[in-house]
Amino acid sequence: MGKVKVGINGFGRIGRLVTRAAFNSGKVDIVAINDPFIDLNYMVYMFQYDSTHGKFHGTVKAENGKLVINGNPITIFQERDPSKIKWGDAGAEYVVESTGVFTTMEKAGAHLQGGAKRVIISAPSADAPMFVMGVNHEKYDNSLKIVSNASCTTNCLAPLAKVIHDNFGIVEGLMTTVHAITATQKTVDGPSGKLWRDGRGALQNIIPASTGAAKAVGKVIPELNGKLTGMAFRVPTANVSVVDLTCRLEKAAKYDDIKKVVKQASEGPLKGILGYTEHQVVSSDLNSDTHSSTFDAGAGIALNDHFVKLISWYDNEFGYSNRVVDLMAHMASKE
């Protein structure tokens, strides 16, 4: 079949960057966007200008009630209820559910009522099967109508954990992600439901936070189920995060052995997903990087041959958005 036709629900950070990734890569066609809070002219502006990734290198305009990107007209909907979006009329076969609101099978399933064939949730899901490109995407089969692309942090951790586990065996591990701020945080102190710390000013604080990313690795690599957990520190940077995986190895390994297998994976089966660098990089050097995870060979340390701390960077917005596109292209190849 030709390129799969895609609708985007929620034109926020991920919705816009999945759209950019789709146009950059040419792997899927964006044919429709739904967002009840952003009108057409505002969409043009928000897509064109981006404080983090810079101006869109292409053309974008409003014409005849449609958003036209690089000459491609995109149908715009403004429905609040996902079951009322006429995806079928717009020709959208797959829908990226990127509002962050409809993350369960039941809620995301509403898109199927409007004619979509499949839904890809751009967030972890309580009950939808999760796929991480390069790790368990081969397990996808086309009986599945609703899937999750997991979280950006799981996409960073899982490829690294897979390589380490396949080569040396992970007995147990703890992950910390030093994570850039996201839209759910507050610019200054404000109220925040159950987790009071999450409501503190994002620009002023290092904020300890929870993340299900490490436990989720056990869902995509079943042999690691119950062997990994972790937490996050939200820090005052706009984008790019870093995973610190501290783990006990079954087989003895010198740090150079670890570097070698990660480098091999980055040039072989995980090319484009897992990167490898020996450069003295800092977070901003990874801005707009398309990898899920970039192993920092110079930053990790070994206490001994069985206990290591491994460091891997990720552009939590753009790397992830590119994997959403890759997952859809993979799913389309199975139709």
Curated annotation (Swiss-Prot):
A motif ([IL]-x-C-x-x-[DE] motif) lies at residues 245-250. There is a cross-link at residue 186 (Glycyl lysine isopeptide (Lys-Gly) (interchain with G-Cter in SUMO2)). It is found in: Cytoplasm, Cytosol; Cytoplasm, Cytoskeleton; Nucleus. It comes from the Eukaryota. The modification S-nitrosocysteine is found at residues 152, 247. This is Glyceraldehyde-3-phosphate dehydrogenase. Pfam families: Gp_dh_C, Gp_dh_N. The modification Deamidated asparagine is found at residues 9, 64, 70, 149, 155, 225, 316. GO terms for biological process: glucose metabolic process; glycolytic process; innate immune response; microtubule cytoskeleton organization; neuron apoptotic process; peptidyl-cysteine S-trans-nitrosylation; positive regulation of canonical NF-kappaB signal transduction; positive regulation of type I interferon production. Homotetramer. Interacts with TPPP; the interaction is direct. Interacts (when S-nitrosylated) with SIAH1; leading to nuclear translocation. Interacts with RILPL1/GOSPEL, leading to prevent the interaction between GAPDH and SIAH1 and prevent nuclear translocation. Interacts with CHP1; the interaction increases the binding of CHP1 with microtubules. Associates with microtubules. Interacts with EIF1AD, USP25, PRKCI and WARS1. Interacts with phosphorylated RPL13A; inhibited by oxidatively-modified low-densitity lipoprotein (LDL(ox)). Component of the GAIT complex. D-glyceraldehyde 3-phosphate binds at residues 151-153, 182, 211-212, 234. Belongs to the glyceraldehyde-3-phosphate dehydrogenase family. It comes from Pongo abelii (Sumatran orangutan). The modification N6,N6-dimethyllysine is found at residues 5, 66, 194, 215, 227, 260, 263, 334. The [IL]-x-C-x-x-[DE] motif is a proposed target motif for cysteine S-nitrosylation mediated by the iNOS-S100A8/A9 transnitrosylase complex.
